């Protein structure tokens, strides 16, 4: 039992830190360019537009000034899960941050091979 807890303790600590640090965003609304990329972006609100997310004309059609299909795909998925509720989008971002934190820990652990980071 003690060995098992020793192995998962860093993951629990990193998860708790990520959640604590980013949880203050949960009650915030959309900001900055979210009105263009999410709130007023009709292309993320219909399955008929799914293929357009990956087209090179997306940034012209959407009003965005950049072509970021993976980011836009997350907006598309978020919209169908949460609707236009910013809290859901923030929750997804916390989950993605947490996943990246844990992946970075695993990568560093593999690179160093010590497991004592």
Question: What is the predicted function of each stretch?
Answer:
Residues 104-117:
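Transmembrane-helix signature of polytopic, membrane-embedded enzymes
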Residues 1-20, 110:
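Start-transfer (signal-anchor) and selected internal transmembrane alpha helices
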Residues 18-19, 26, 91:
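Acyl-group handoff/entry surfaces in thioester-processing enzymes
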Residues 23, 101-105:
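Alpha-helical transmembrane segments of polytopic integral membrane proteins
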Residues 25-83:
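Extracytosolic (periplasmic/ER-lumenal) interhelical loops and adjacent juxtamembrane/interface segments
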Residues 6-14, 68, 72, 89-90:
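Residue-level signature of transmembrane alpha-helical entry/exit and packing/kink sites
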Residues 16, 33-34, 74, 93, ...:
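Generic structural signal for small/hydrophobic residues in well-ordered secondary structure
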Residues 69, 83-102:
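Loop-to-helix entry region of an early transmembrane alpha helix in multi-pass inner-membrane enzymes
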């Amino acid at each position: 039992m003690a060995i098992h807890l020793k192995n998962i303790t860093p993951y629990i600590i990193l998860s708790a830190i990520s959640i604590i640090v980013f949880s203050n965003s949960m009650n915030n609304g959309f900001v900055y360019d979210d009105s263009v990329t999410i709130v007023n972006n009709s292309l993320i609100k219909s399955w008929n537009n799914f293929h357009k997310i990956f087209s090179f004309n997306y940034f012209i059609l959407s009003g965005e000034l950049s072509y970021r299909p993976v980011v836009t795909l997350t907006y598309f998925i978020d919209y169908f899960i949460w609707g236009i509720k910013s809290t859901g989008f923030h929750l997804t971002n916390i989950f993605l941050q947490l996943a990246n934190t844990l992946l970075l820990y695993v990568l560093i652990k593999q690179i160093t091979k010590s497991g004592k980071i």
